[in-house]
Every structure is written in structure tokens, then in C-alpha cells.
Amino acid sequence: MLLPAFPDAREGRPAERTALERVHTPEYLDLLATLTQPTWLDYPNTIASETSWTAALLAAGTAIDAAEMGGFALVRPPGHHAPPHTAMGFCLINNVAVAARHMQAEHGVGRVAIVDFDVHHGNGTQDVFADDDSVLYASLHQAGIYPGTGALGEGGETTVNVPLRPGCGDAEWVHAFERHVEPAVARFRPELLLVSAGFDAHEEEDIYLVDMHVTDDGFRELARRCAALAPRVAAVLEGGYNLATLPRLVSAALDGFSSGNATAG
């Protein structure tokens, strides 16, 4: 789905394997591509089957399309927990990392910033770009929950982790973003901003150990702020598992991206 400047929806296209190889090891991709039965890749969180390769290619390709066109990729499976060599935390392919590498390799984009507001830290994305000063990774997440990474100060010079206490809501969430993420992105001056848009910090989510109280307005405001940080912005869906609220939250984020784009322009 495209951002409001291009208010039409379309089906994504599967990624080429070469795009995935910019992020993931050939051995892991071979394993995923040749599964013939349900197999635990990350017990007890991530199982894959003979159809998972097709789904993973489509998710990654849709993320690439979104990055190219300034869109919002509504995909499953999500991706931000997947490191280069394996699956993890429901994630098979790191969609946002694949999109970032594609834009650098195929479209000459230099600096890419990735802002991740999923309630869980995106350990996979952090790992992919740990030694790459052309990509800034900034994560706003609840402290002390899965996957146990993302401590304050963890990572290199182009990593910004903002762990938040359980129970915080819109005001603390937005303040942390304003204080820590916005200045880091502004200093980095990205040509492209990719958003790992997870909605599982919402007050109506019911996930083990998650205790956040972000509202629809909180997601709208964070999306608005993200859209004002770079000349080109795209988003990829990460977490968010309450099917009764997810469409509403995506709509709120799209509203925010639209108003942020207008402000930036």
C-alpha cells in the first residue's frame, strides 16, 4: 500500500533471491527455499513450511516496492528479528534490511535511516547493520522483554536504542522519540527513512510481558514525526496482532505520514 501522497493499493511482487543475498547467508536461504514439511527454525517461536519461501519472497519484494515508491508495505511474515543466518521471532527474512540494501545497490541511495517502533527490539536489523556506517538504526521498544537485546548504549555509533519502562503511554513514548531518535536522525541526514512499523505497543494488544499503553493518537504522532525526518520515507509492517485494531492503527499511521510529509514539504 502506498503512502497518502499516492492513495492506491496494489499487490506486491516477490523479491529476487539476489536481493535477499545482500542481507542473508546463502546457506540459510537454501534451507528456507527447500523445506518440504513444517520445520522449527527457531523453537518455539518460528516454524516454516514448504510454502514459507513464497511468502517470504513476497514480503521482501513488497518492502522493496514500498521503498521505491514511498509506500507502506502490509506484509506477513514480519522481519526485524531475523539476523543474516537464521529465522527468529516469527521473522524469516529481514524485509526492511533487504529494502535498505536494495535502495543502496540499485538506486544509488547513500545514507538510510531505519526507525523501528515495534514494542520488541529489532535485534536482527541491528545485527545486519552493526558495522555499516551508511545505515542508522534507531529502536524505541519496551525494556526487559523478548528478545532481550536493545539496551541503552548497545550497538555501534549508528545504533540508537531507547528502551522504555513498562506501562508508559503516549506522552513518554513521544517524548523519548523527540529526545533521542529525532536528533540522531537529523545529525545523520538520511536520504531515505524506512520505518519498521510495529503496532504491538498499543494499549489493546495482549502479548506476553508486554505492558505499554500507546493509543491510536500516539502512533499517528510518531508517524507524523517520522515523515518529517527525511526527503523520502517508506514503512514496512512489523508486529501488531490484534486484528480488531490493526486496520485502525495502520490508518492512523497513514494519516500521520501524510501530515508529516506536508510539514516536511
Language-model features: locations:
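HDAC/HDAC-like amidohydrolase catalytic core signature
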Residues: 1-115, 120-265
